[in-house]
Amino acid sequence: MSNVYQLGLGDKKVSIRLPERAKARVLVPDYSPALVDVAAAVRKALTQPYGRPLDDLVRGLKRVLVIVPDRTRVAGLKEYLPVLTKFLADCGLGPEVVQILVANGMHQLAGREGLPEFLPRSVLDGLPVSEHDCHDKTAHFLAGKSSRGNSIYLNKKVAEAELVILTGSIGLHYFAGFRGGRKAVLPGVASFDTICTNHRLTLRSGEGFHPKCRNASLDGNPVNEEMLEVLRMIPPAFVLNTITDAAGKILRVFAGDSVKAHLAGCEALKRDVTVRVPAKADFVIVSCGGYPRDSTMVQSHKAIDNMAPILKDGSPMILLAENRHGMGSDELLGWFDEGGVAGIRRKLSSKYTFHGHTALSLSEKAARFKIYMVSSFEDDVVRRMGLTPAKTVEEAVTDVLSANAGDLTTYVFPEGSETLPVLEEEKGAAAS
């Protein structure tokens, strides 16, 4: 007797067959139903926001900047952005006033040919659109210095605006606590050095990662605190954030004050994605949730990070992650040649980069667990990261079951990048 499960891998669904002895339990977020009328929900959020309505804020303005997420984010952009831009047009703000800036952070630029993949055609044809390049020093201005000494360089278009509208989705983030809100600015439209200095706050000298720099953690999180500081350095900001399911369907919309609206969304998401488990697992199978959540290794490794607290040390994990856009950084793979966890940590303490951080996080998990990865990578690339390559899920499952006799406590996560599993006794501390 066996059970069959369907998990996402890129744009496809793959079947996984597990025997009864695996004692598999499927764990998914408890999302609210998808919105039937997204346009109506967005308009309501804009006119009844947390704080002043958007039509009141934009009255008489000559320069409005709309910051949107890049192609790595599932945000429902093609649904909500046309509603937002029409709302602005109805307020008398057209292409001579409104422009779009893609918040790439340190991610790869999409290029003109890649923009239609995630931006609606009506916006591309109707408004000026540009991409933020964190490496283009001529495109940045000094907004100020944070209390921790970080020189905050941002895209000049922010300084030129009278109002900045921050859009995107709210989701878990493995060291900033949550995506959305303030992250559209830092790291979204910040310079490379500014981003690296902010992200370096995740490390404590000689002690590894800061304990507050983790999923669903905002209070006392130095990365988040500096991001909030930056909001006070820029023109007035209005947020439009969504919560989506793995298919990209919009479930909720939050708008208004850049702090209050985002916090309300974080609280709602936390309730949705936190799942209880009675004990640590002997075996975990996790999908990122398909494309674009498994678009690059930078994105895919977040699913591993989410699972680590509820898997027994030394136990197997199977990760389904297509990684069609590769590593997500030209430098990431080289970090795995630094001599394991200790070597990466040494180099990172003297020369911090975000991708070194990712390499350290992944290497720590690879040292604790046996992680199989089903992906589009060549086997040698997977092994270089300390992971075990598998051509198919069946191959990985067979290997795990043959190496582990008897019953197993198995958890299956179809939406691992957006699921926060916690042990039942730790449930109350999940959002501290």
What do these predicted ranges mean?
Residues M1-K44:
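N-terminal amphipathic/basic leader segments beginning at the initiator methionine
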Residues R63-V74, Q99-G105, I285-S287:
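Short glycine-rich or small-residue beta-strand-to-loop segments that form or flank ligand, phosphate
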Residues R73-L93, S300-L311:
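Histidine-anchored nucleotide/phosphate-binding helix
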Residues P95-G105, P316-A321, K370-S375:
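Short internal beta-strands
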Residues A110-F178:
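An acidic, phosphate/nucleotide-engaging active-site surface
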Residues F209-Y291:
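Membrane-embedded hairpin module used as a gating/binding unit in multi-pass transport
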Residues D294-Y372:
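C-terminal catalytic subdomain
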Residues G356-E418, E424-E426:
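Internal helix-turn-beta structural module
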